[in-house]
């Protein structure tokens, strides 16, 4: 990674990271949302940011690839203290995906209030 002359090194820490984004119209409604993996790699985590306040109950998100759960459990977006801009993140055990494979984001519909959310799925494509 050095330039050969100055001895300066460039970090490659994120060189093999690819982020997929999924927009959810209402995290409080039970539904499935889909995104296609453009390259082969491993899902290593995902994050959610909400655009409002959840009321009554927590929202749970899960990811599936080919009907198999990504990681050991889903992500809980707590209604207590929720507000626009609240971010939740889950690290997962690496789940392999192939280029062109569908990734499903599932909402459980157990919270109330119409709240949009943005999901970012982190892939390691090294």
Which residues does each predicted region cover?
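Glycine-rich, low-complexity segments
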Residues: 1-30, 51, 58-60, 64, ...
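A short beta-strand element within beta-rich, extracytoplasmic domains
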Residues: 42-53
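Extracellular and analogous surface-interaction loops
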Residues: 32-42, 93-95
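Hydrophobic residues in beta-strands and at strand termini
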Residues: 37, 50, 79, 92-93, ...
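Short, surface-exposed tryptophan/glycine-enriched loops
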Residues: 85-99
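Short beta-strand-plus-loop segments that form exposed binding edges in beta-rich domains
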Residues: 105-112
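Ser/Thr- and Asn-enriched, surface-exposed coil loops between beta-strands
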Residues: 40, 81-86
